[in-house]
Amino acid sequence: MKRIVLLVGGVETLAYFSIQMGNEWKRMGYKVFYFDLEDEMNSAKKLRRFIKPGETVLVTFNFEGLEKEAGVYREGIGYVWDEYAVPCYNIAVDHPYYYHERLADLPEKYYHISIDRLHEAYFKQFYPEFTHRGFLPLAGSRLEELCKPNTGKEVENNRLNIRQK
């Protein structure tokens, strides 16, 4: 895939994540399009020109762009992502139980990514019908193997026991 769609204009921190990732992908030679949730209809026109089937993916956080927003979803027609067969990679920052209703109607090529091992286990158990693309540690998070020798403290379930601090 040579083209990446990211979303901005929604939750400020999620837009920040998207912009930072987009900057790096641009540096790596990918074409990046920012769909602006504050200007959905104008962004939708530009989005349709940007998408090249077979070359474009959506990378989003917490279902932004997958909530039937104007510009990416039309009643009776569905998502633009399905129309152009765009794979949708959703990095779920919050616990999956917040998203039960959103999981009811998603694009055909929806892929779920968890940032927490417990969220990942919950998602696999209660939503086996979706393709899970695994665990993505938060940037700046240390891997368990690196954390133990440096701190001498136990890391359990991706969390440091507060009594050990």
Give names to the regions the model predicted.
Residues 1-6:
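Extreme N-terminal starter segment of soluble prokaryotic enzymes
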Residues 14-126, 144-145:
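Extended catalytic core of nucleotide-activated donor transferases of GT-like folds
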